[in-house]
């Protein structure tokens, strides 16, 4: 009986851990002068695998919960990267080119991820 209770508790814990995370795949199109925003409201860290599948370079930035923006990398066409982001951080995918950017993202982590486009701020 103890073994059965332990097994049920273990399975419940595994299901809860699985439900708390989410795997998302997205093929993004980012127009000239725009950036895509992912996240900003997660309660835990999350991971992003990105591959630039388009004709122009993209910039990957991290915006912290305090709105501090840090460059995390630049992806030329065909390049890939895997990055980890802290709880509450947002990933900014900024189009650096004069054509529409394309990028494939695989996101793993908490499922409360905001996704939207916004104009690139003036520097």
Give, region by region, the residue ranges found by the protein language model.
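Positively charged n-region of N-terminal signal peptides that target proteins for export
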Residues: 1-5
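Bacterial N-terminal signal peptides
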Residues: 7-14
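Tight coil/turn sites that cap or link beta-strands
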Residues: 25-35, 39-41, 77-78, 88
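Structural beta-strand segments of beta-rich domains
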Residues: 44-48
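Asparagine-centered strand-capping/turn motif at beta-strand->loop junctions
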Residues: 50-54, 93-97
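Short, surface-exposed beta-strand/strand-loop-strand elements in extracellular ectodomains
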Residues: 55-71
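Intrinsically disordered, low-complexity Pro/Gly/Ser/Thr-rich segments with frequent PxxP/GP/PP motifs
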Residues: 67-88
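C-terminal partner/receptor-binding element of secreted or periplasmic proteins
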Residues: 97-123
